[in-house]
Amino acid sequence: MAAHSTLGVKVYTCWESSAGVKPSSGFTLFSDEITNIPTFDNAPEGIDVTPLSELKSIRRIPGLKDNGDDFAMTGNYNDTDMTTWAGLVTTAATNIPLGKHLWLMITIPGITKAYFISGTPVAMGLPELSVNSAVQGDYHLTPYMDGGWDTKASYVSA
């Protein structure tokens, strides 16, 4: 079994056309300039179900997963990506009250499935700026649902 590289990883976006239904087509490439995608591998919280008769250890069952407050992809800032993200944030003002979320589809070359995350895009701020550095910053998404690994959806652009 061969290992896989991060070379060629891509992030696609698509809005739900029906509230609560992950799109299966219509994804478009967000950016070729993403430099870091954070982990999104959260274990469920443990629910204590220890009976009073237990004398040795606490018993737990899986509870809800906390997807956190922020999913921040880092990228090289450029006008195209900044405009695209700002458009997603603007669309959120209309779609989120209707229960329609933005979906990210993250593809890794050589992996048959893609990873899906839905949420609300957040307006960009000013990134850190320092001498002799690339202008990079974060594209923030407030997670709504962890779609997990699933069949790749069709996309409009590669």
What spans do the regions from the language model cover?
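Solvent-exposed edge beta-strands and adjacent loop segments
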Residues: A2-T74, T120-V135
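Short, charged helix-to-loop "capping" segments that act as catalytic/coupling loops
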Residues: P44, T80-T83
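Short beta-strand and beta-hairpin "edge-sheet" elements
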Residues: M105-T151
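Acidic glycine-/aspartate-rich tracts in secreted/extracellular proteins
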Residues: Y77-T80, D146-G148
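Residue-level detection of beta-strand scaffold positions
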Residues: F71, G75, K100-L102, G137-Y139
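Short, acidic/charged, Gly/Pro-enriched secondary-structure junctions
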Residues: T83-S118
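Intrinsically disordered, low-complexity terminal/linker regions enriched in Pro/Ser/Gly
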Residues: A153-A158
